[in-house]
Amino acid sequence: MELEQQMNRRKFLSTATSTLGALGIPARHAAASEPTPTTPEQHPSRPNVLILMSDQHKRSCMGVAGDPIAATPNLDRLARESVRFTDAYCTNPVCAPSRASILTGLYSHHLESRGNSKPFAPKHKTIADHFNRAGYLTAMIGKMHFVDAQTHGFNYKLEFNDWWQYLGPKAQLYADELGRPNSGAGMPQIDTLWENNDPWSGLRRPDGRLSSVAVGRASEIAEADHFDNFVARESIRFLEDYARPNEPFLLISSFLKPHDPFMPAQRFAEMFHPEQMQLSPTWGKADLEHLPAEVRTSIRDCRWTPELKIAAEARKRMAFYYGCLAQMDDCAGQVLNALARLGLDRNTIVVYTSDHGEMLGDLGLWNKFEFYEGSCGVPLSIKVPGHAPAECSAPVSLVSLTATLAELSAVPLVAPVDGKSFAHLARDPASPLPHGPVFAEYALGEPEAKYMIREGDYKYTYWVHDIAELYDLRNDPRETTNLAARPEYRATVERLQRALFAWHRPAELAAESVHTTSPPAT
């Protein structure tokens, strides 16, 4: 059986290479890595795994989360069939570092992944490496922001460059549309498609400085040609062509939306109107005096898009965000429907999550980069066949997703991970087994470096060069009152800071340096 399975895998890789060639897609994207598999007899009912992933989805922007505007029927349906984790967090509120943690189960400081331009080293194993070794066929279709395209471990991979080639001459139209208001939202640097070989050309003022990102508008690109639609089609094709009994697969279908620029296809742009939008209750009401300087500056200047200080422009941006979200939901629904049509849903663990959130006007902030709930919180639904749906309010981290899925699939880990499995919660949210605090980090080694711990009702953020933040999420879910400087919370601050430093002590600090509300003396 092992020999037969290896032959089937070789047949797949050969077929994939031929198919890619017919599409005009380079064969190098079907990586011919030959794992040493376990046999199906060892795990006759080993489940498939499908991970649906989006980019910049604010956790609260779902119908199932109580948002009256969000058009997310497919993700809502999945959430109602799953254990929905209401308090899930990313490890780093920016694309590439967060995705690296999801893929590897390691924190950013171990990966040395400091931003969108630094790849993690090939020595780090990914979720694909673990599942490959267990005999799974592993595929990644869509955005993963690898930076270095070889550090992934997947047998089969289609991403931005493959989509560009699918677009053919229309790629220039998309590059022009994207280049006017934004850098490319994590697109590969195909320099010849950008004006003056500059992916930031749409943001350049005459003096060379960067200007603002556009508020949003309807895309000029046909709906079928959008990246998310490409991801949905290719994911369905993978399921139709390569899903086999007793040959389990791990498929990550990773969508770009609702990441900015907020340019949904025409019909989704028309679904929402600025007049419908309700600005965040904290928009324009932040308590600036008790916030770190970096946050105050972002609120005051409305970084990248100063127009958003105007209520009408803020509502317009929200409408286009919801349009992008609706388009992504539609694409995710196509994949889920195909899974059911093919009868694969009965033995497939299905996950939905996002790499980080979007502030969407909370506290007057937009985009990501923050540890506030809108930015660092992520949606997370895990559907395990045979287990009842429920909600789970225990804080969990995406760094633990690899370990969790490995345990749920009886897949041995081939390398250590930082994340601790919460499979017990995915099976039974009422499980009495403990699951530790959640940690996050941002801008390692930079002046704005900060670290976060969420434990119980409290979230504590340590800024290396600024004042600390402490929020009681039970009584202050919108994070309007920073408690860190209040004497009655000193013990709470010190307890959380000790736990945070036990997890990771920033290199910028002296060994004995501990502070509560202000940076250490220099």
Each predicted region: which residue ranges?
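Formylglycine-dependent sulfatase
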Residues: E2-W463, A468, P477-R505, A511, ...
